[in-house]
């Protein structure tokens, strides 16, 4: 047990206060939290109450950090979890912050996958998109659902346009038709298009039988 002898607003951050128990600095926390907890000068406080306040303050800091992160750029749950862990927040605190954001639909892997696919389809095939989303922690169920909605004809049209542009650049530098075909094929593969799509487009553009 101890007596709160002083509550001082921090000079560098007016939203936080320093709390002194029995004349000694004991902890710092969010000013609003102090108000909500009904803590004031001359209040009696024990060590368990202090631990709970510090724990709740850590959650507030974690939540605010999470909010700032998703305000800058939308994240998957894994990306945000990793970001918060890098900042030193404990797993239980991170879990609470993530649940808070999910409750207000500020963190939604399904929505993220939809937006990511829509954006990347302008320049990438489904394979590259798929593996990028896997690295970002999107679940297999979400991936299967969202990738199945991709229009194959539209994807192939995009692949052809990208290949045509690349082909016009390559043919100015490469006179060997076999090498040209191989370079174009590898380019399309690197963009995430499947073998059959790449093979068909290369044959169509180069009008030859150099593809194996």
Swiss-Prot record:
Transport keyword on record: no
Cell compartments where the protein resides: Cytoplasm
A single Gene Ontology CC term: cytoplasm
Source lineage: Bacteria, Bacillati, Bacillota, Clostridia, Eubacteriales
Name by which UniProt lists this protein: Regulatory protein RecX
Family assignment from sequence similarity: Belongs to the RecX family.
Annotated organism of origin: Clostridium perfringens (strain 13 / Type A)
Chief location: cytoplasm
Leader sequence residues: none
Keyword terms of this UniProt record: Cytoplasm
GO biological process, one term: regulation of DNA repair
Gene from which the chain derives: recX
Annotated Pfam families: RecX_HTH1 (PF21982), RecX_HTH2 (PF02631), RecX_HTH3 (PF21981)
Task of the protein: Modulates RecA activity.
Gene3D superfamilies, sorted: Winged helix-like DNA-binding domain superfamily/Winged helix DNA-binding domain
């Amino acid at each position: 047990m101890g007596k709160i002898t002083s509550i001082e607003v921090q000079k560098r951050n007016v939203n936080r206060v320093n709390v002194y128990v029995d004349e000694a600095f004991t902890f710092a926390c969010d000013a609003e939290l102090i108000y909500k907890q009904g803590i004031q000068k001359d209040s009696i406080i024990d060590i368990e109450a202090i631990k709970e306040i510090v724990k709740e303050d850590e959650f507030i800091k974690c939540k605010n950090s999470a909010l700032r992160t998703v305000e800058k750029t939308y994240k998957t749950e894994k990306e945000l979890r990793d970001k918060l862990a890098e900042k030193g927040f404990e797993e239980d605190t991170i879990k609470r912050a993530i649940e808070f954001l999910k409750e207000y639909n500020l963190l939604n892997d399904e929505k993220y996958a939809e937006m990511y696919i829509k954006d990347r389809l302008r320049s990438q095939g489904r394979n590259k998109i798929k593996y990028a989303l896997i690295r970002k922690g999107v679940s297999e169920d979400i991936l299967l659902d969202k990738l199945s909605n991709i229009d194959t004809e539209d994807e192939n049209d995009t692949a052809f346009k990208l290949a045509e542009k690349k082909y016009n650049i390559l043919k100015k530098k490469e006179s060997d038709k076999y090498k040209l075909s191989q370079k174009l094929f590898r380019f399309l593969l690197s963009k995430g298009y499947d073998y059959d799509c790449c093979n068909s487009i290369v044959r169509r553009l180069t009008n030859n039988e150099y593809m194996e």
